[in-house]
A protein has these predicted regions:
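Sequence-pattern detector for short linear motifs
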Residues: 16, 68-70
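Extracellular ligand-binding/catalytic regions of CAZymes and related secreted enzymes
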Residues: 21-26, 32, 58, 70, ...
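Catalytic phosphate-donor-binding core of small-molecule kinases
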Residues: 65
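A glycine-rich, often tryptophan-bearing local segment used as a flexible ligand/cofactor-contacting loop or short
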Residues: 1-62, 124, 128, 134
């Protein structure tokens, strides 16, 4: 009936990269190491930034060590790039969070460093991850006929 799959960063060494996503996705070594690098919301009205939490650039304050790594640098038009960021004197990286509708669910690839943010309690990281898990659920009616 459809579900969601969230894939967190991977290296392109030793895995079948062509099988990592239902659509074309090319992993790279692109990364943003400055944890204070400015984040731009490319798709501010996208569900992943609005339900159940309204994600703003403030949610990226207090991140530790880095923004993310192994961002894809090429992908199918089935994906929507959600964020843009870059280190000083680098080009913008737009592959840190990619969302694609797939069947009745969603496929999400993220290179964001949640594994660094969760242990130190970065609330914005938790809020964004909750949204990734909740995508597609905004208009679901529960078993009692009550719309969430």
């Amino acid at each position: 009936k459809g579900g969601n799959m969230v894939v967190q960063y991977n290296t392109n060494r030793g895995i079948k990269v062509d099988k990592i996503a239902p659509f074309d996705l090319q992993l790279s070594r692109d990364r943003v190491t400055d944890e204070t690098a400015e984040v731009t919301l490319l798709a501010p009205n996208h569900e992943v930034l609005n339900f159940p939490n309204k994600i703003t650039t403030k949610d990226f304050e207090g991140w530790t060590q880095e923004r993310g790594l192994y961002f894809p640098d090429q992908w199918s038009s089935d994906f929507t790039p959600i964020l843009s960021m870059h280190d000083k004197d680098e080009t913008a990286k737009t592959g840190s969070l990619l969302v694609a509708k797939h069947g009745k669910g969603y496929y999400i690839y993220t290179g964001l460093s949640f594994f660094r943010e969760f242990p130190v309690g970065v609330s914005g990281a938790y809020r964004l991850f909750a949204n990734m898990l909740s995508i597609g659920k905004q208009d679901i009616t529960n078993d009692n006929g009550i719309k969430n």
